[in-house]
């Protein structure tokens, strides 16, 4: 279901044939399947190919992004966009705050320093019910949102590179 508060972006710069990387934290398998399905559907609809790398948890996502982006570029097959997917559910300790803040900060640092179109789909929620509402494509579809964010940034990057 589309979020009525969010107007669709009008930039239709061609990005078909681009290559995306999805890095997912498989801490909650079933939730992750829903996030991944939403992201993959958006990439396919836009005509992108993609690779998926799985890491143990959200804190490992930024390092995996950096490693994969560097390796792909060195092999002459750079990634054009990156989508980070995972879920952090609040517990009784400060672990939630550390994981949420540090993974987001590191992803933003990567996106800015490398001019990397990146969509952050790491859910940070209080309950598993909140996570499911955000993960399901039939509800808030945050996996799809993260992919759309990365695609929007890729369109901007391509359009401005041609200007």
UniProtKB/Swiss-Prot annotation:
Give the metabolic or biological pathway: Cofactor biosynthesis; riboflavin biosynthesis; riboflavin from 2-hydroxy-3-oxobutyl phosphate and 5-amino-6-(D-ribitylamino)uracil: step 1/2
User: Please, one GO biological process term?
Assistant: riboflavin biosynthetic process
One Pfam match, by short name? DMRL_synthase
Catalysed reactions, semicolon-separated: (2S)-2-hydroxy-3-oxobutyl phosphate + 5-amino-6-(D-ribitylamino)uracil = 6,7-dimethyl-8-(1-D-ribityl)lumazine + phosphate + 2 H2O + H(+)
Which Enzyme Commission number(s) are listed?
2.5.1.78
Active-site residues annotated for this sequence: 95 (proton donor)
Q: Which GO terms describe its molecular function?
A: 6,7-dimethyl-8-ribityllumazine synthase activity
Which class of enzymes does this protein belong to?
transferase
Q: What is the name of the protein in this document?
A: 6,7-dimethyl-8-ribityllumazine synthase 1
């Amino acid at each position: 279901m589309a979020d009525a508060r969010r107007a669709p972006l009008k930039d239709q710069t061609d990005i078909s044939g681009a290559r995306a990387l999805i890095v997912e934290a498989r801490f909650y398998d079933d939730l992750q399947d829903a996030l991944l399905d939403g992201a993959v559907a958006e990439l396919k609809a836009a005509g992108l190919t993609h690779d998926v790398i799985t890491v143990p948890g959200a804190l490992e996502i930024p390092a995996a992004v950096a490693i994969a982006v560097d390796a792909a570029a060195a092999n002459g097959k750079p990634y054009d966009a990156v989508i980070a997917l995972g879920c952090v559910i609040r517990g009784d300790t400060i672990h939630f705050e550390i994981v949420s803040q540090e993974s987001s900060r590191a992803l933003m640092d990567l996106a800015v320093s490398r001019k990397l179109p990146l969509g952050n789909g790491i859910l940070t929620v209080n309950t598993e019910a909140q996570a499911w509402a955000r993960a399901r494509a039939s509800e808030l579809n945050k996996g799809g949102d993260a992919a759309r964010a990365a695609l929007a940034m890729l369109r901007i990057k391509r359009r401005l590179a041609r200007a």
